[in-house]
Each structure stands twice: as structure tokens, then as C-alpha cells.
Amino acid sequence: MYLDEYKRWLSANLIDFDLHAELASIENDDEAIKERFAVALKFGTAGLRGTLGAGTNRMNIWVVRQATQGVADWIKTQGGTQTVAISYDSRLKGWTFAKDAAAVLAANGIHVRLYDELMPVPALSFATRYYHCNAGIMITASHNPAKYNGFKAYGPDGCQMTDDAAAIVYDQIQKTDVLTGAKYITFAEGVEKGLIQFVGDDCKEALYQAIESRQVRPNLCKTAGLKLVYSPLNGTGLVPVTRVLSDMGITDITIVPEQEYPNGYFTTCPYPNPEIYEALEKGLELAKKVGADLMLATDPDADRVGIAMKCPDGSYELVSGNEMGVLLLDYICAGRIEKGTMPKNPVAVKSIVSTPLADLVAKHYGVELRHTLTGFKWIGDQIAQLEAHGEEERFIFGFEESYGYLAGSYVRDKDAIVGSMLICEMAAYYRSIGSSIKQRLEEIYAQYGRFLNKVDSYEFDGLSGMDKMAGIMNTLRTNPPVEFAGRKVVSLTDYNKPEETGLPKANVLIFGLEDGATVVVRPSGTEPKIKTYFTTLGKDLAEAQKEKDELAAVLKPLFS
């Protein structure tokens, strides 16, 4: 079957020369052909993501057209404006995929609002809402290596597509022949017919105004003298992040030169993920050189932001997503109470794998902290529930441990622009009172306890990898450990059982240990990985780290 499909592609006019060359190069390599054609990339609530290349199991113009036709078929049943917003980041073939998606939608009589320059995830979510679209499409693979690209789908609220909508789109994709099934007109024809229009400056300005309105202490940064190093990691963050920081009064910004402009090859950091040290390395070198107070880095689609803070001894320390989530929650709560801008019955939201330290901080400030499944769409869903009752202003902050933050209801996905703005404002505030982010973090630990949150990942590549991941999760369910490193398991929460959790079904297991530590195990939703999340609590960092290391050592053989 897969050989027949390979031969069909090989004999077709694939338009993209790269695809022809790749197929010709694997003509006698059965394993390579099987990898590309035995299965197809599956469309889910996060859309598609895969390696660039030829075949049904790769990202290419034909798979993008097929997916877009599936989205178009769904939209045509929805009424409304019959409009889709599209954006793209700096990844290879991003503009090509965005134009092809627009052309397929136009061929279906659907209007398109396309950004005329690469713009990040929050800009796509905002445009979807601004133009009252039926859907949004973001061409991105987030922080994956350069060989990846993806097709992220959004619903009319600017949140990732719901399970029901994604299932309908997937069904339509399966009915659409990948090479011949999608309707198509040229991009130029779509523009001439008035079906394809660019996103207007009014929308872009409205986004910046919405973000800047989320400042806790407006005008503070104009006099704080904050010195910043910033890296967009060759992605979309440069223009929007520097625009907002400049508007709020931060002018001493040094951009990492090798990572300033869009470059889908990511030559200076092969894995452009602000969660990891390697992605921040160039920025840290520059921060030390210029004596910056803070170093920021946003991932290619600018929905995540990582930082390194300057410590009193002049060294720099990376701040984890959990730590920054707690710091921002603490800063927003304290600041809004001080300024009299805290709404009545305020609500914050975090994912179930994020630090329980946030619960203690929220309780201290009288804030309701809601827990959601992993994936920012669930935080967006909580905002939508508030909005349905006209109470979206109750939402003050949401975060995930994977460096995603949102303050405000103007978009429904994580936003590294507002995250960068608030982190800089927070740093400027602590600087203005003779303190620092580092000092405030230590004060939080002194007040609530020394929590340590760490994530380990185990990769399972290829077709066999998915089977192995499924087998590991099944073993943990059917024969769960009764202890980890001598610590008894006192609770096991299986999120595959919504009747027990009160949340939608999810492939997540949480083991609670007798000393209060937790171990969370879940497959990644976007990559061939199983992730393990450890939360330990000690009298100091060394004690908490020792327990984490012991727990990780026991778990490691399960994933080998």
C-alpha cells in the first residue's frame, strides 16, 4: 500500500522541486519510504506537526492543502463570517504554507485575513477574534528543531480548536485525496477576487493596546533604568516585543545579533526552546558582557519566554517556568491590590503539572486558582466560561510550567509579548525598591517552603516509538508502582477517568508520595516524548534536589 502511494507521488507533478528530489533519493530504500507513506500525520486539536519532507507523514504543500480543505469543509457548515485568519513564523516554508492555505480557502469561497509579515501566535489568536473569524491557522512548529513545521488550528474564540471540531476536520481530511482532493486557485487570483486580504494596521495596533493595558504599574519602567538583553531566537518576537517594551519606557535593549532576524535554520541554537540553557547561551554571553539586569528569549512563534536574572554576586541564573509563573502571580496580585485594580472574585489558572506553590500564593492573596489539563487551550476554556457570564475581567493570570503565560482575555493562547512586558515591569519594580527578582523569589520560598519542580523527557522516535510510549503508559496503569525510592505511593490519579477527576479525559498519571512529593507522567501532545514532572519539597534546595534525583533514577529504567 505505502509503495503504491510512493509511486503515485513520484509520478505526480509535485510543484515543489525539493519533494521530487527527496523521493528520487529514496527509491530503493524501503524503510525510508515506509516512514514517509505508511501513515499520515494526524490532525488533532493542535493541528498538525511533523518533519518537512515528501509523503503523507511529512509536512509539505500537499499535506497543508489537504488539511486546509478539511478546515474549509468544517467552516462551510458553521455560518458566521466565513473568514479565516492566517499567520506564520520564521520556519522553513512558512510563507509558502500560509499562502497555500489561503489559496485553498479562497477556492472554497472563504475569506482570508493573512498577515503580510511573520507574526506570532498571540497575534493570530487576536486577529481571529478581531475579525470575528470562524477559525485561525498558524503555520508553526513552536520550539521544535529546524526540520519541523506545523499547522496549528484555532476556533472562532482564538483558542485552539475543540475536540469536536478537530474530529470533524479530521474526518473531512480523510475523505480528501492528498494530491487531488483540495480545491485550489492561485494566491494572486484569491487576492484579485477580494477573498484574500492582509491584516490591517488597525488590528495590529489594537493588539499592542490590549497588551499594554495589562501593565500593573504603568509608567514605572520609564524611570527604572532597566538594562535588558533580548533574543527572539531568529523567530517572530523581534518587532512585537521591542515595540511593546519601547512603548512602556524600556529603551536600553541590546538584541543578540546572531539571533535578531528571522532564520528558519536556527543556526546558533538548533533547538530554539527558551526552556533550555543552549537556547539562552548566546544571550547570556552578551548579558555578562554588557552587565544587563535581565536576559529574555522568546521562541520562534513567541508564545513562550525564558529568562535569566542577574544575581547580587553578578552571576546569572535561569528562572524556570514554574518559578516565573509564581513570581508573576505574586507580582500581579500584590500590584493590583496596591493599585486598587484587582477585580472582585479574581481568578487565576494553572495546569495540573504546574507547581503547587502557586496554590499557596493564590490563597495568600484571596485569589481562586483553577486547575486545568495540560495545554493552554484549557486555560483559554476557563476564560471562555467566565466570558459566557460577562465576567472575563475576573481572569488575572494563567500559566503553564512550560514557560507559557497570559494576563488578560484579549487572546486565548499563551503570549510571550505580554509575558516579556510583565517580566520586565516586575524586574523594574523590584529594582526601584532596592530589591530584585532573585531576592523576591527567595522571599517566596522562605514564606511558603522550598519547592523544586523539574521535568525530564524521554524520546521515542519513529513508528515503533509511538507503540513503546503506549506500552509504558499501559504498564503504569495496569501495574502501578507501590513506591518510588523507598517512598510509598499514597495516591494515584488517572486522568483517563474523567468521572474521578472532574476534568476531560487525558493520558496523564499523577503519583502522590507519602512525603508530599508528586510524580506526573504524560506523553507529550506535540512530540514523540514521555515527560515526567517531579515536585519535591525540602528544607533547602539541596534536599529537594536530592529527592528529585533519587526519584528520577528509579523511574529511568521504566523508559529505557
At which residue positions do the language-model features occur?
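An N-terminal, well-structured beta->alpha segment
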Residues: 5-101, 108, 190-191, 196-224, ...
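N-terminal small/polar loop signature for handling phosphorylated ligands or for N-terminal nucleophile
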Residues: 85-148, 249-306
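Conserved phosphate/anionic-ligand binding catalytic regions in large, soluble enzymes, centered on
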Residues: 37-57, 141-144, 228, 232-244, ...
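Glycine-rich phosphate-binding loop plus the immediately following alpha-helix
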Residues: 154-184, 322-345, 350-361, 416
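Gly/Ser/Thr-enriched, mixed-charge loops and adjacent short helices
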Residues: 32-41, 149-279, 285-287
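Phosphate-binding and adjacent anionic-ligand microenvironments
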Residues: 288, 292-294, 315-317, 335-522, ...
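Short Gly/Thr/Asp-enriched flexible loops that form oxyanion-binding sites at enzyme active sites
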Residues: 97-105, 148-155, 303-323, 358
